[in-house]
Amino acid sequence: VLLLGMGFLSAPAKAQKVVIEDDAPNSIVLVSQDKAGDEIVRIMNETQSPRFHDPKAPRFVLTDRKGRFALGIGGYVKATAEYDFGGISDDVDFYPSMIPNGGQNYVRNQFQMDATTSTIFLKLVGRTKHLGDFVVYTAGNFRGGSKVFELQNAYVSFLGFTMGYDYSTFMDLAALPPSIDYAGPAGQVFSRATLLRYERAFGKGWKAGVGIEMPVVDGITNQSVNISNQRMPNFPAYIQYAWNKSSHIRVAG
């Protein structure tokens, strides 16, 4: 798998530069006029998606003159190759439900390559008196029909609220294991939706969230069975307890 990150850097020509760099993996280098860039680095890091296939914080960003707002432009190029020795699935992703039964016609051996999961994103972060830390994020890859660009995320987040198109509140992104296969492990809960969500941390290690989401219904239809229009939104909610940075338990419904 080949990963490539790209970014751009801008700074006032006559301003005194302060270079701010953290030492963590996938760290950020920020050039600004003063130490206000520390807040930008913190917000970029704290708002990263924990999902393995999502891009991390951009290493280079564009900032305003005071270093209070920053726009990250980045992504990665990813290519995978696979060889199927037993005709398991005629798809670039692995879905156990697509494994054919005996007697069906299928190619026993197959070689495939795919680069459609390569991702591009824009991330605007900042901090204001009334909104606190805020994030405006949009990302997409080329998983649309005929390999066209497809929106994956587009939302704004502030004061615990998230509005836009994002992963469902029902999902636990931090619980998804790393995988080469973009589809992820069998049986995982995975859903994106247009939503309005509110999340808040409280107590020691506790966090809860509730959302209003656009429902998406999928099923098998025929001449006698069809899917009707949805009259009500979904109302997912969760509560989570974490005893350290890498361990937690969550109940969602």
Task: Kindly give the residue locations of the regions a language model identified.
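N-terminal periplasmic/intermembrane-space "pro-region" immediately following the signal or transit peptide
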Residues: A13-F85
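Intrinsically disordered, low-complexity segments enriched in Ser/Pro/Gly/Ala and basic residues
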Residues: L9, N26, V31, Q104, ...
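Detector for outer-membrane/organellar transmembrane beta-barrel domains
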Residues: N244-G253
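Outer membrane beta-barrel
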Residues: D64-D93, G103-V217, R231-M232, P236, ...
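Polar low-complexity intrinsically disordered regions enriched in Ser/Thr and small residues
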Residues: F8-S10, K14, I40, D90, ...
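Solvent-exposed loop segments that connect transmembrane elements
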Residues: P96-N101, D218-Q230
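Bacterial N-terminal signal peptides
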Residues: V1-F8
